Amino acid sequence: MITISDAAQAHFVKLLADQPEGTHIRVFVISPGTAQAECGVSYCPPDAVESDDIELEFNGFNAMVDEKSAPFLEEATIDFVTDQLGSQLTLKAPNAKMRKVSGDAPLVERIEYVIQSEINPQLASHGGNIMLVEITSEGVAVLQFGGGCNGCSQVDITLKDGIEKQLLDMFPGELTGVRDVTDHQHGEHSYA
């Protein structure tokens, strides 16, 4: 469920040494499955352990995860990174904003997951996003661009060389192409 690097485990052991005996760490997601999802790590004293918590054992400590957060912490990683500017704890949870879907889920759910977890985070660097409108009976994913992508002069390249290639590679035999139905209006909001 959660991978904690050796450096992060050593960091937690050091921090927990100054806490009352029996204190663990808690890894959680606030507003899981939403665009506002935020992950965190906190101390978990013995009296804060809930009966439905999932207990993960590590070297010298345990991590508690509440039942509601658990599916959103699948594939999460915690690391402790040190560089010339100092050190910091990093927590990456690719499924925090959207629950990972199974490989046998309907095509529309699997495409939505890829859009929300992989494509939109890339487009967000330019203030953009895409939305799946429908999948046609011919297997074409109909998309609508928003934000900085709306009216962007690079939208055709993004669509054909980026998004379409990625989706066709991920869903061979299920998708035949992608189509943009956005009424592009170039303006100050447009990236380029």
UniProtKB/Swiss-Prot annotation:
Give start-end of the signal peptide: none
Asked whether the UniProt record includes Nucleus among its keywords, one would answer no
Transmembrane intervals: none
A single GO BP: iron-sulfur cluster assembly
**Taxonomic path:** Bacteria, Pseudomonadati, Pseudomonadota, Gammaproteobacteria, Alteromonadales
Q: Which organism does this sequence originate in? A: Shewanella sp. (strain W3-18-1)
Q: Where does [4Fe-4S] cluster bind?
A: 149, 152
Task: Report the family membership.
Answer: Belongs to the NfuA family.
Please describe the quaternary structure of this protein. Answer: Homodimer.
Cofactor: binding comment: Binds 1 [4Fe-4S] cluster per subunit. The cluster is presumably bound at the interface of two monomers.
Q: What is this protein called?
A: Fe/S biogenesis protein NfuA
Q: What does this protein do?
A: Involved in iron-sulfur cluster biogenesis. Binds a 4Fe-4S cluster, can transfer this cluster to apoproteins, and thereby intervenes in the maturation of Fe/S proteins. Could also act as a scaffold/chaperone for damaged Fe/S proteins.
Instruction: Write the record's keywords in alphabetical order, separated by commas.
Output: 4Fe-4S, Iron, Iron-sulfur, Metal-binding
Alphabetized PANTHER family for the sequence: FE_S BIOGENESIS PROTEIN NFUA, IRON-SULFUR CLUSTER SCAFFOLD PROTEIN NFU-RELATED
